[in-house]
Amino acid sequence: MAQATGPHRRRWPTALAGLLLALLLVGCSAVAAGLNSYQSPDGRYAFLYPTGWTRVQVEGGPQVVFHDLINSDETLSLVVSEVASDKALTDLGSAVAVGENLRRRVIAPEGSGRSAELVEAREREQQGRVFYDLEYRVRLADRDRHELATAVVDRGRLYTLAASTNELRWPKVKELFERVIISFNLLV
């Protein structure tokens, strides 16, 4: 087997390193493809939302709402609630307990005409903070929906970011919604 000698032998590692760097950069850009970033005006939190979605104002509703211009029933919303300033998310209960509480009180309260099932509840840590990631199947009178949410507590506030779509579109947007939900981050 012939071996490269001279200047060709020295170019091989450089070319390989260049190729690996190019592949890495393409992979990184693909992860964020189709997403835009949003940061609160006070710089307190940030998250990613799908390209092509627009922000809408909802009077008396969530603090931030985005929806898809094409599939108007796909939404992303951030609700900020007050909790005791000395409470951590884990003080409110486990991921399952908090998920069930949200299901009963917010997603499908009695008399709403909706029913919901908590499909999955898990805890994750990000930058020293505990997050609960929650997945729901929601049944309305005329259609079924799927919802992903994440919850975190900071300085007396419970932040709940939720992405929702109809059940038929769920398989197509599942990975995108997962990236959106785990992108939620407290900055200060």
Residue ranges of model-derived segments:
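Bacterial N-terminal signal peptides that target proteins for export
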Residues: 2-17
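Bacterial signal peptide processing site
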Residues: 29-31
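Soluble non-cytosolic domains of exported or imported proteins
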Residues: 44, 92-100, 167, 171-175
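C-terminal motif of bacterial Sec signal peptides marking the signal peptidase cleavage site
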Residues: 24-27
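Surface-exposed amphipathic alpha-helical segments
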Residues: 155-188
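Short, low-complexity, disordered segments immediately C-terminal to signal peptides
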Residues: 33-43, 62
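Proline-anchored loop/turn motifs at beta-strand termini and strand-loop-strand connectors
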Residues: 42-59
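Conserved polar/disulfide-associated segments of primarily extracytoplasmic proteins
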Residues: 56-153, 158
